[in-house]
């Protein structure tokens, strides 16, 4: 039987069902009358962050009108991480923002410890928000006796207490299948599209710097309604390219190189050199995650790339001698958090014109 609604109306959408009066446990009472009443329950959102990208976490909070959660993240003299959650999270919907960018292992361990603290503090749900998912390039066994570390990270996130994952531009989309919990995989592309439309570039061709990025490049070219080309390459090893060739017409065109991430910038700068030799005019590079170690910075300074367009998924210091435009994905992540909390669909956040990407 449905319990009665409160006087004057139907029960609220979010409610707790409570009994009025003592529970009768004696077998002598096979039937009894029990009254119920509805108590409205707020599905409170709290957002916390580790040390990897606090500016992004604060921007996410600002985009949805929340304060960043209060926690202490420190280290003991021997280097061990110490975490304390400084406010009540019992029964609340918690989102933990942490990019697993370099130092990757430190940021991962910090995240595991924070999730353990939140779980032990009785948070009702913990969503791991990873704007950048580290170890994503180790997604398969491509050599004998090597690990699949992307899967190991997925296992560890769940073991630490994650009930859901929100991430952006995974290096390999199949990583979503490494989890047995819900994964919401967003794309930075809508934010980047808006910037490119404002630039109003003419004679533009989208170029994938390798075969693996062709699907992403196709989505860009379809949305921007421009041509598509690809740089085919043969690798000597993980950091060196042996030979490259351009498939498509780029002579006299402005070029947009697109990729999900760059660290050493070897692929991007080598492709830019080849494209300039083949007659490209201005060369723009667009990556969701610009990790950029010292080698990558030096390569960009000497490269033919006129502008590097990226996002704030990874925190990095200012770099002299390279034109870098950083776009914020805080609004996109904030909207996803609102929808997840209210059990609304996030589908429209990862659907791109001409290509459903997830």
Regions found by a protein language model. Give the residues of each.
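PRPP-associated nucleotide enzymes
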Residues: 1-20, 24-358
């Amino acid at each position: 039987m449905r319990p009665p609604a409160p006087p004057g109306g139907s029960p609220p959408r979010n409610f707790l069902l409570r009994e009025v009066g003592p529970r009768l446990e004696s077998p002598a009472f096979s039937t009894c009358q029990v009254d119920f009443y509805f108590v409205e329950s707020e599905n409170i959102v709290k957002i916390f962050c580790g040390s990897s990208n606090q500016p992004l976490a604060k921007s996410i909070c600002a985009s949805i009108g929340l304060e960043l959660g209060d926690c202490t993240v420190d280290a003991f003299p021997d280097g061990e991480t110490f975490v304390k959650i400084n406010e009540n999270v019992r029964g609340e919907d918690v989102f933990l923002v942490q990019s697993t960018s370099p130092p990757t292992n430190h940021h991962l361990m910090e995240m595991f410890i924070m999730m353990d603290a939140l779980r032990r503090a009785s948070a009702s749900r913990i969503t791991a928000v990873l704007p950048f998912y580290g170890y994503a390039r180790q997604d398969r066994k491509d050599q004998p006796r090597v690990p699949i570390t992307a899967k190991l990270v997925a296992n560890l996130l769940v073991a630490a207490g994650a009930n859901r994952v929100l991430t952006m531009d995974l290096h390999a989309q199949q990583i979503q299948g490494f989890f047995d919990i819900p994964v919401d995989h967003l794309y930075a592309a809508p934010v980047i599209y808006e910037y490119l439309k404002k630039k109003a570039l003419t004679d533009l061709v989208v170029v994938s710097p390798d075969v693996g990025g062709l699907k992403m490049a196709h989505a860009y070219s379809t949305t921007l309604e421009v041509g598509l080309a690809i740089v085919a390459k043969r690798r000597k090893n993980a950091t060196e390219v042996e030979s490259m060739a351009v498939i498509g017409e780029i002579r006299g065109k402005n070029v947009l190189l697109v990729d999900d991430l760059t660290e050493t910038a070897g692929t991007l700068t080598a492709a830019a050199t080849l494209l300039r030799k083949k007659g490209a005019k201005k060369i723009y590079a667009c990556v969701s995650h610009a990790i950029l170690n010292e080698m990558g910075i030096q390569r960009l300074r000497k490269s033919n790339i006129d502008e590097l367009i990226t996002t704030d998924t990874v925190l990095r210091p200012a770099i002299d001698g390279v034109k870098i435009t950083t776009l914020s994905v805080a609004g996109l992540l904030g909207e996803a958090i609102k929808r997840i909390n209210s059990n609304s669909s996030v589908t429209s956040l990862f659907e791109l014109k001409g290509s459903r990407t997830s």
